Amino acid sequence: MYRLCLIATLALSPALALAQTAPTTLSCDGAFAKDSDYARIVKIFGAANVTDEKIHSVGVGEIKATVIYGKDAKRRLEVVWKDEKARKNPFVMAKGADSAWKTEDGIGGGASVADIEKLNGKPFKLYGFEWDNGGLVSNFNGGALAKRKGGCFLGLSFSPPDDVGAELYKVSGDKEFLSSDRNMRAVKPYLWQITIGWQK
């Protein structure tokens, strides 16, 4: 019995080791470089931690995605391939205020607009809430976050808290607001999605 347990443990250990040591950093190189592909994702995170699923895309519906740590809500990461047939050129999404994923400069789920404004070095623009692109940062206004080391782009989306009041309607709709807008600050939106990808 002991021998069987030992064999099972040894068989699982590579996947466990990868799960424990694989990074949770969103950067323009390594696993998520422009030339990355499905094989590289599997090599870095382990086959046991990588699955193919269908996810919901706003305004599109269900799309195919490669999911890393699909059973772990905090470490779950969704990868959509720009070259779907070859599964190359990743578009990567970390969702949720409690996501373990962070960018190299420390941007993580749950951050406030003030937190991101500080990292950007100046106010940025984001769309109003209550529509498909609600809360999406539309322009970093030439701030520090406008360009990423390595050349990929950074996408950020904010969400209002569940208990938000009538003040939400002052910053809703298909129009842009500054992160420094007093009505936007009053809503206290939090960062719920971080995206990195490539324009071409």
Cite the ranges covered by each PLM segment.
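Positively charged n-region of N-terminal signal peptides that target proteins for export
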Residues: 1-4
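N-terminal signal peptide c-region/cleavage motif recognized by signal peptidases
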Residues: 12-14
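Short helix/turn-capping signatures at newly exposed starts of structured segments
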Residues: 18-133, 137-153, 157-200
